[in-house]
Amino acid sequence: MTETSPPPVLDTAQARVLGCLIEKEATTPDAYPLTVNAAQVAANQKTAREPVLNLQTGVVHHALRQLETLGLVRQQFSSRAERYEHRLGSVLDLTRQQVALIGLLLLRGPQTLGELYARSERLARFNDADDVRHHLERLIQRGLAAQLPRASGQREDRYMHLLSGELDVEALQAAAARAAPSAPSGSDSSDLDARMQALEATVVELQEALAAVQARLEAAGA
């Protein structure tokens, strides 16, 4: 694929699995590349995933093989278990920061600039929110992301990846409205967001520590 090639069109399972590979490469390097089982656990996490899914092992395995066919994933044969790593950056000629942003959008759907900046801390380094905006604009120019029109009541622009085809903007706006029917305003909202992000980060760290232990046990038994 080149900068002028159209982006691939991924289904829900493929998008989730690819996002998980991007995330875990940065957050649990000891457990990466991922086994099929580890990819399934990551795909079905209850935190840092929007929407929460319940993908079966066969669905995850099929998604990995399809991503491999598209050239976005590569299988490693270094142990008894199949392990997979993503190739998004090399295939689409993206920077680490751009790969991280695509990963977040694959895992959590439409997000604001501030959300992407806060959530990207463990995936890639950005100087500030303007740096995030710069990389988002580059992705938009490449046809890999889009800025969504603001829905009624929304104060900030949101961004979404385009790796699953054209966006249904009305459906995305309706989903956002259902997710936050009575959000608090002002400083209360900011404080709540900060507490939720801190709690979410703690839960994810515990899950990743468990995944690293499982990976070491698998390696010891290989």
Swiss-Prot record:
Gene3D superfamilies: Winged helix-like DNA-binding domain superfamily/Winged helix DNA-binding domain (1.10.10.10)
InterPro entries on file: DUF480, WH-like_DNA-bd_sf, WH_DNA-bd_sf
Superkingdom of the source species: Bacteria
Family membership: Belongs to the UPF0502 family.
Annotated protein name in UniProt: UPF0502 protein XCV4380
Organism: Xanthomonas euvesicatoria pv. vesicatoria (strain 85-10) (Xanthomonas campestris pv. vesicatoria)
Upper classification of the organism: Bacteria, Pseudomonadati, Pseudomonadota, Gammaproteobacteria, Lysobacterales
